[in-house]
Amino acid sequence: XKEYND
């Protein structure tokens, strides 16, 4: 999975 924040 991938985690990201903008």
Curated annotation (Swiss-Prot):
Reported induction: Overexpressed in acid environments.
Domain of life the protein comes from: Bacteria
Protein's UniProt name: Acid shock protein 2
Lineage of the organism: Bacteria, Bacillati, Bacillota, Bacilli, Lactobacillales
